[in-house]
C-alpha cells in the first residue's frame, strides 16, 4: 500500500523529535548476524553426565555416531565441565561443512546413544536465533484449535453421471476448467483471471491443478477448485509430480534466499535450487543445488552453459525411490520418505549420460524378490565401447548389459508396462560422414532379458513411441540433410508389430512404411490401437494423419502373420498446430496452436479418434489446453472382464442416452423458438390494443388503416386548440428519363 496520511501512526506525526524516530526497519536490515560463521556447529544434548576424567572416553564413544554423517575430530568436540568437575550433559561439535552439520541434525536427532540416553541435536545458530531474548513468550498460552472443516471430495469429477471429462484452458490472463460436452459447447466449471503467472499443470491422477507464481506453487482441487496446498519456492520455474501424487519437485534458476521468520523454508534450503516436497504435509523433504548451474572453479568462462536437465529427479514406479544423475559421474538413488541416500553412497558410473526408471513394477522371470529396474547408458570412452545397462534396485545389481560401437547418441524408451525397453542407437559410419539408427529391444520379462536387434533402418530415427499397454510401435525416420538445401528432407513413417508364432508373439517386424511425409511427432491414444502422426511446430506443413492399427477390414496378404492391420482413417490440417492431446478415454483428440510458439491463428480444435472435427475454437492469446487425467480404474480384473463381456448391452444404454441428450437439445431449441414466437404475438396484440385506444381518442374509424380510404379522407382541422391529424399520400404517376448532350 502506498503511504498516506491515514496510514501514519501517532509516533510518525512527531517525527521531528529525533528520539521518537522509528528505525527498527533499518536495524533489522543492517543488523549484524551473529550466526554467520557458526553454521558448521551443532549442539548435542541428552549426553550422560560424567566426571572430567571420563570425558575423553565419552567423546571417543560419541565420535562413532558423529562421523557417520560427516567429518569431525575429537579436538572439534567441546564438552563443558562445571565447578564440581562434572560434565553438563551437552557438547558443541564443529563439522567441516554446513551440509554435514545439517545432516547431523537430520539423521542423529532423536537417535539413542545407549539404553538410557537419546541424542538431541540442533544447529547452534538455531539456538541463537530462537533462544534470543523476546523470541519466546515465557507465559504458556494454549494453542488455538481451529474448528473442524470437512474436506472437499478431491475426485468428485469422477462421479459425473454422464462420465464426462474435464479440461483446463489457459488464454490471455485467464484459466478456466470446463466439461467436455461432445458436439455441444463446453460447460464452464470455473474461470479465473490471474490464476497463474507461468503455466498450469494437472497432477498425474488429476487430483490437483497446480498454478505457478513468483512466490511458489499452489495446488487447487475439489468441486469449486479451492486452495488445497501451497509450496513456497521463490521464482519457481519448473515443477514435477511423482507418479502417485505423493511428492512434488520444484526448481528455480535462482538460489533460494531464506528470510528469517519464514515458516516453512529453513536455512537448510538457503542457496539451493531444487526442493523435494511431501504433498500431504506441505513440508520440504530435502533441497539440492542444481548440477546444471554449477561449473568447475576457474572454468566457468570457458565452458558453455549447460542445458537444464528436467526432470532433475526421476521417480520409481512405486515412489519408493527417486534418483538424480550427475552427468558423466554417478547416479544418486534416494529412499523415500526419508530422502536418505540408498546404501549411503551414490552409484559411480563413469561417463553416464542418461537413465530412466521402468514406468511399472516388473516381475522378471525367475526373480522372486522385490525390485525396481533402472536403465542407463554410457558413451565410448577411449578403447571402451558404449554400454547400456539395466540395474536392479535396491540391490544395485547390474542384471543386463549391452556393448555398442560407433555410437553418436542413445535414447531410452520404456514400454508403459515395463515389458520392453527400446534403446535407440544413432550410429555413425567409420568415416563419420553418414548416420543410421538401429533398435536394441530388451525383453525385460523373459528369462535372462534377451535383446532383439532391429537393424533394417537405413536412416536416422527422429521420433519413436510405444503403443500404451501394447507391443507395437511407430517411428519416424529422416533422410540425410543435403548441405545448402533450402528445403528439409522428407520423412518416412514406419509401423512395427510382432509376428504371430503359434499362441505366442514372435520378433518385431516392419508392417508398413509411408514415404515422402513431413511428419515429426507421434501421439498414441492412451488406450492404444489409434495413433495420430502429425507435423507440429512447422511453418509449411500442418498435417495430422489418424491411423487405426487394428482395422477390421480385409488384411493385406503380406501382413497376415503380423499382429496389426494398419489403415489411414483421415488426414486433417490445422494451421500452425503446436500440440496434440488425447483425452484419457481415447475418444477425443485436441489439436492446438499456442501463442507461446507463434501468434498466428491461435486456438484449439476438437476431433474424434477417427479424425472427424467436432468444433473449431479460434482463441486470442491461447496458451494451453490440458485434459484432466483420470486415476487408474478401481475395478478388479474380474470386474473389467465382466464389463467387456456385457459391452454390447451397455452400448445400447449409452446410445439411448445419447439420443435422449440430442432430443433434449432439440426440445430446448423448439421451446426457445416457441417462447420467442409467443412473446412476438403478445407484443403485436398489445400494440394493436394501444392503436385502437388512440383511434377512439382521436375519433378515427376502425378502418382508417386502409390506404384507399385514408387517401380520400378529409383533413381534420383543429378547433379550440385541438390537434390536426393529416395524412399525405404520394403516388408516382409517370416517370421519364432524359439524356442531355
From Swiss-Prot:
InterPro entries: EIF3B (IPR011400), eIF3B_RRM (IPR034363), Nucleotide-bd_a/b_plait_sf (IPR012677), RBD_domain_sf (IPR035979), RRM_dom (IPR000504), TIF_beta_prop-like (IPR013979), WD40/YVTN_repeat-like_dom_sf (IPR015943). It holds the Pfam family RRM_1. Residues 40-126 form the RRM domain. Residues 13-22 have a biased composition (Acidic residues). GO terms for cellular component: cytoplasmic stress granule; eukaryotic 43S preinitiation complex; eukaryotic 48S preinitiation complex; eukaryotic translation initiation factor 3 complex, eIF3e; eukaryotic translation initiation factor 3 complex, eIF3m; multi-eIF complex. Keywords: Cytoplasm, Initiation factor, Protein biosynthesis, Repeat, RNA-binding, WD repeat. GO terms for molecular function: identical protein binding; RNA binding; translation initiation factor activity; translation initiation factor binding. It is found in: Cytoplasm. WD repeats lie at residues 193-230, 232-289, 303-344, 514-557, 572-610. GO terms for biological process: formation of cytoplasmic translation initiation complex. Residues 1-22, 695-722 are annotated as: Disordered. Residues 1-10 have a biased composition (Polar residues). Component of the eukaryotic translation initiation factor 3 (eIF-3) complex. Belongs to the eIF-3 subunit B family. PANTHER family: EUKARYOTIC TRANSLATION INITIATION FACTOR 3 EIF3 -RELATED (PTHR14068), EUKARYOTIC TRANSLATION INITIATION FACTOR 3 SUBUNIT B (PTHR14068:SF0). RNA-binding component of the eukaryotic translation initiation factor 3 (eIF-3) complex, which is involved in protein synthesis of a specialized repertoire of mRNAs and, together with other initiation factors, stimulates binding of mRNA and methionyl-tRNAi to the 40S ribosome. The eIF-3 complex specifically targets and initiates translation of a subset of mRNAs involved in cell proliferation. This is Eukaryotic translation initiation factor 3 subunit B. It comes from Aspergillus clavatus (strain ATCC 1007 / CBS 513.65 / DSM 816 / NCTC 3887 / NRRL 1 / QM 1276 / 107).
